[in-house]
């Protein structure tokens, strides 16, 4: 994964994928499958021209540290404040949360989503699981969701809305305006309705940095 030149796929919007760490390629493949163009984003110079951004799953503490080392954290927060559509999956949701209730060391994330999250809420990777989720915003059938060392949304503030919850009531998908977050990994299941929803959000926003 080298360079930040848009991939020659489709003529849709140019969507960045934060490429500091995590399952970057999977998101690129899904986005390009929908006809979007993609750009790997690591530094502030990679932001101008994109119409949306995906923050992939991975290790949130590593991603947080690298985002500051590469100088992308503050410009990205400014872009979010300016209305850039962003979709965060798993660690990406943690990065978007305004509060990380069990943050370690100086972990801060980027923020923007009016939620608090709890890291690794379901235990270690051996405790990963799959479940079908009812997501009214996406209609039938249920979304088959894969949770891998996943966070959970501990609380949803007044600016955000829950899109999906587990049977025990724990929230695992949220939206706030142009921001979208899921605890799980739609990019690995073949059910790509959350990516389609995000691209619709990008189109509705109709903006570029």
Swiss-Prot record:
PANTHER family: PYRIDOXAL 5'-PHOSPHATE SYNTHASE SUBUNIT SNO (PTHR31559), PYRIDOXAL 5'-PHOSPHATE SYNTHASE SUBUNIT SNO1-RELATED (PTHR31559:SF0). The keyword Lyase applies. Pathway: Cofactor biosynthesis; pyridoxal 5'-phosphate biosynthesis. Disulfide bonds: none annotated. It comes from the Bacteria. It catalyses: aldehydo-D-ribose 5-phosphate + D-glyceraldehyde 3-phosphate + L-glutamine = pyridoxal 5'-phosphate + L-glutamate + phosphate + 3 H2O + H(+); L-glutamine + H2O = L-glutamate + NH4(+). L-glutamine binds at residues 58-60, 119, 148-149. One of its GO terms (cellular component) is cytosol. Belongs to the glutaminase PdxT/SNO family. In the presence of PdxS, forms a dodecamer of heterodimers. Only shows activity in the heterodimer. GO terms for biological process: glutamine catabolic process; pyridoxal phosphate biosynthetic process; pyridoxine metabolic process. Keywords: Glutamine amidotransferase, Hydrolase, Lyase, Pyridoxal phosphate. InterPro entries: Class_I_gatase-like, PdxT/SNO, PdxT/SNO_CS. PROSITE patterns: PDXT_SNO_1, PDXT_SNO_2. This is Pyridoxal 5'-phosphate synthase subunit PdxT. Its EC number is 4.3.3.6, 3.5.1.2. The gene is pdxT. It holds the Pfam family SNO. HAMAP family: PdxT. GO terms for molecular function: glutaminase activity; pyridoxal 5'-phosphate synthase (glutamine hydrolysing) activity. The active site is at residues 90, 185, 187. Catalyzes the hydrolysis of glutamine to glutamate and ammonia as part of the biosynthesis of pyridoxal 5'-phosphate. The resulting ammonia molecule is channeled to the active site of PdxS.
